[in-house]
């Protein structure tokens, strides 16, 4: 179960499709239940997999639960994995049903969901229940694991994201114009991502590196404020707002970049649990500048694959960007290290970790097999 892949192909939605592809490739039958803001239930086949769109509305909860139960019983599904929504009412009820019917269940947390659950009056209970009910609990980083309110029944599994490693070979770094200095931002345009801090630092950088360009990829509620800030700073055509990009166009932007910068902040209810964009940039040999917050230090190794600065310190951000753009050798060294490290993060390996938290093991043929059937449980 996840959020609706048709509503975006980044983040959690992209994970859902990557895991589905890996599981199907291994001969495992998969069906995806996608919660969306719509009110109607519909069914389609997406990349060869049955995808059922269900409403996340509270008022549609009985119908959503009925549809989920039908999916599980008609197809004799023996495992349920909540890729997102583990602490929601729908997620908790499905975990209860899975436990009653002796189906394996697992849930994955990202950091932001754990912090936001604390805002609700019933937040502590909604966090405790999935940890008690699920057979396996995963987190997207060691940092996110540290946010769990208590240790679940089985040790939590770290499930890092993967990258599409084959794509990078289509965009060789050797073909890039080294004289062009392109700084890249990829992310939702929300306060926590810190695009405003990047614009401010970039405005100062332009005074010393007038040929530098900034590409901002993403969409969100802060777009109008960011456009106004760019205009106020007089950045003109040195900044390009591309909107949300996916697929080949996004890969082309990565391949053209000199440096990825994501100056994330942390608030009481939101955090960067890991930062898949750092791995995506690394896949193209692009080093990163990030902040020492949340799980970012697990994605960017300071001095090895990029640089880390303190959150909201535009002077540190400016210094890090300038020092790297002024030193092509260092930029190349960090980029090579970033690529080497990113290539270790495959979706196949990430899928192995998902199956591990669900209690599967490898058999002699190299496939993942469930050592305990429902009858044995």
Task: Annotate the PLM regions.
Residues 143, 162:
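Carbohydrate-associated surface elements
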Residues 238, 255-270, 286:
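Acidic donor-binding loop of glycosyltransferase active sites
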């Amino acid at each position: 179960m996840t959020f609706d892949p048709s509503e975006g192909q980044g983040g959690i939605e992209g994970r859902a499709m990557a895991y589905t592809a890996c599981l199907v490739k291994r001969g495992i039958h998969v069906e995806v239940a996608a919660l969306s803001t719509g009110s109607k239930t519909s069914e389609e086949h997406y990349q060869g997999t049955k995808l059922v769109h269900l409403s996340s509305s509270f008022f549609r909860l009985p119908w959503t639960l009925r549809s989920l139960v039908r999916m599980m019983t008609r197809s004799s599904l023996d495992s349920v994995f909540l890729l997102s929504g583990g602490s929601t009412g729908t997620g908790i009820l499905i975990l209860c049903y899975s436990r009653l019917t002796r189906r394996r269940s697992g849930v994955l947390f990202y950091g932001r969901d754990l912090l936001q659950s604390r805002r609700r009056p019933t937040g502590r209970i909604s966090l405790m229940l999935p940890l008690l009910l699920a057979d396996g609990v995963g987190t997207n980083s060691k940092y996110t694991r540290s946010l769990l309110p208590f240790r679940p029944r089985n040790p939590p599994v770290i499930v890092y994201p993967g990258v599409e490693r084959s794509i990078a070979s289509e965009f060789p770094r050797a073909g890039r114009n080294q004289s062009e200095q392109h700084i890249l931002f990829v992310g939702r345009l929300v306060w926590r991502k810190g695009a405003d801090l990047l614009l401010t630092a970039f405005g100062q950088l332009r005074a010393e590196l007038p040929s530098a360009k900034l590409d901002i990829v993403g969409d969100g509620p802060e777009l109008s404020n960011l456009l106004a800030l760019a205009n106020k700073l007089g950045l003109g055509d040195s900044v390009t707002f591309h909107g949300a990009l996916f697929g080949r166009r996004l890969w082309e932007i990565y391949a053209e970049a000199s440096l990825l910068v994501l100056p994330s902040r942390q608030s009481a209810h939101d955090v960067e649990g890991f930062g898949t964009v750092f791995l995506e940039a690394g896949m193209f040999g692009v080093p990163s500048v990030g902040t020492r917050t949340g799980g970012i230090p697990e994605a960017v190794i300071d001095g090895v694959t990029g640089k880390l600065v303190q959150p909201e310190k535009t002077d540190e951000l400016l210094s890090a960007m300038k020092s790297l753009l002024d030193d092509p050798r260092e930029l190349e060294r960090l980029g090579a290290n970033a690529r080497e490290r990113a290539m270790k993060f495959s979706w196949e390996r990430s899928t192995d970790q998902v199956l591990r938290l669900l209690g599967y093991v490898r058999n002699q043929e190299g496939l993942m097999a469930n050592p305990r059937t429902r009858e044995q449980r």
